[in-house]
């Protein structure tokens, strides 16, 4: 695509990365997990997400190094977050958990622990030694232009070069986000399973009570 550059994220991209994470967490709804689970306002959450990104921990969704930025005609258009699960011996869940525990107020962590039994009803483990596509976000003005496909393919190709034997890419999406499911199918993902919680309380905590796991196999 003429005028398109896909590059590594850097510290100057943090404001846009924070926006990306917030919008991905909401998944097209008004439910924001940093508020419902941790009890933070959106502004408090943004500041804490920024602080976690500044820790520069690799290989999870709160890592600057996990992001690629799409720039079209010198304007930031979107971003992806992806990483190789367990690349340095630790799971992304553990890395993210460590960042949350280190950064957020103790009261927020205790609140989340109380809600943990409910949240586990939708938890899907990441597969080790696979590429995990953590999130994809495009600004509204840049949607419907085919940028999602280019951004995802570029990021997968980059990670594949780091570990050539990788053959699987996974993405998790809330099942009611039909636009996202459709977009992932267009770029080669297939639905392999879904997980639904029967606990109605989860609808007050997360955007939906069902998650879909999708897989793209690499040659």
Question: What would you call each of these model-derived segments?
Answer:
Residues 1-15, 19, 23, 28-35, ...:
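Conserved N-terminal entry element of GNAT/NAT acetyltransferase domains
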Residues 39-67, 71-72:
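Active-site rim helix/loop that mediates acceptor-substrate recognition in acyltransferases
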Residues 71, 103-105, 136-143, 174:
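A short, internal acetyl-CoA/4′-phosphopantetheine-binding micro-motif in the GNAT/acyltransferase core
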Residues 129-131, 159-172:
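Conserved GNAT acetyl-CoA-binding A-motif
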Residues 135, 144-158, 182-186:
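Conserved acetyl-CoA-binding loop-helix of GNAT-fold acetyltransferases
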């Amino acid at each position: 695509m003429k005028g398109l550059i896909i590059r590594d994220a850097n510290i100057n991209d943090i404001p846009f990365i924070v926006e990306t994470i917030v919008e991905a967490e909401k998944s097209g709804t008004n439910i924001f997990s940093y508020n419902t689970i941790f009890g933070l306002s959106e502004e408090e959450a943004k500041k804490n997400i920024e602080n976690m990104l500044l820790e520069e921990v690799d290989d999870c969704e709160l890592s600057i190094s996990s992001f690629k930025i799409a720039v079209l005609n010198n304007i930031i258009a979107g971003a992806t977050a992806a990483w190789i699960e367990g690349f340095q011996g630790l799971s992304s869940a553990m890395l993210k958990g460590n960042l949350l525990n280190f950064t957020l107020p103790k009261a927020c962590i205790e609140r989340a622990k109380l809600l943990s039994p409910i949240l586990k009803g939708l938890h899907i483990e990441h597969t080790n030694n696979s590429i995990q596509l953590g999130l994809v976000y495009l600004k509204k003005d840049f949607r419907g232009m085919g940028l999602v496909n280019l951004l995802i393919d570029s990021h997968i190709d980059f990670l594949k070069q780091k570990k050539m034997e990788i053959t699987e890419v996974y993405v998790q999406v809330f099942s009611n986000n039909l636009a996202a499911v459709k977009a992932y199918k267009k770029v080669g993902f297939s639905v392999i399973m879904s997980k639904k919680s029967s606990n109605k309380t989860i609808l007050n905590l997360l955007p939906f009570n069902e998650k879909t796991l999708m897989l793209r196999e690499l040659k």
